[in-house]
Amino acid sequence: MRSELGVSLAYGLMRSLGQSIVTGEFETVGFPTEAELCTKFGASRTVMREAVKMLSAKGLVSSRQRQGTRVEPVENWNLLDPDVLRWLMERPFSNKIFLEFTQMRLAIEPTAAALAAQVQDKLAIAAIREGLEAMIATAGDQDAALQADIDFHVAILKASGNPFFWRLKPLINNALRLSIELTNKISGHTADIASHEAILVAIEKGDAVAAEQASESILKESLKLIETIAALKN
C-alpha cells in the first residue's frame, strides 16, 4: 500500500511540473529525464513516476519506452481538469486561448439563456437576479464585481435545466473569469449592467429568442474587444 506521504509528495511534484508545462516552461526545451527530475526535486524514482502518471492522466505528457517522456500538444490536454484549467489561467497572455474560451461561451451561453426562458425554473431565475443585483451592489469593487458577473452567467447555466451544461460549470467558470477579466481591462470598466439585465428580463418574460439574442450580443462584443487587442499586438 502506498504511504500517504508518498502520495502527497507525488501530488506536490505533479502540481509543480504541471504548472511548468502549462505555463510554457518546456516549450523550447525537452521535458527532463526521470533522473534529472529526481535530482532536481530530491525525490525517489517511485514518487516521480507516480507524479508523471498523474500528468499523463491529465493529457499533459506521454511516455514511450526508450523515448522518454514528452509534453503533449495543447489539443491533447484535458481542459476539463480543474488543475489544468487553473494553470491555464496562469499562462502569459495568449490571444488564442482567450479567443477560444469566448468562442466556447458563444456556443453555449446563448442556448442556455434561451432554455432558461423556456424552462422557467423560478428558483434558478431568482439566482440569476441575485447575480445581477450583486453586480450592481459591487460596481465599485473590481474583484467582487467580477465574481458577481461570473455568478450571474453560471446561474443561467443552472437555469437552463440541462445537466450537461451544468456539468461544464468548472470549465465555464474559468472561461468566464479569464474572458471577463480581460475584456474589463480592455474596456476600462466592469460589465455593462443594462446588457446583463436585458438577458434576465427576457428570461423572466419567457422570451427565448430575446434571451438568446441578448446573450449573443454581450459575447460578440467581447469577441470584438479581444480581436481589437490582438490586432494592436500584431
Give residue ranges: language-model regions.
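Flexible, glycine- and charge-enriched loops at secondary-structure boundaries
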Residues: 3, 7-10, 121, 142, ...
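Hydrophobic/aromatic residues within well-ordered alpha-helical segments
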Residues: 9, 13, 104-108, 124, ...
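Short basic (Lys/Arg) and small-residue
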Residues: 156
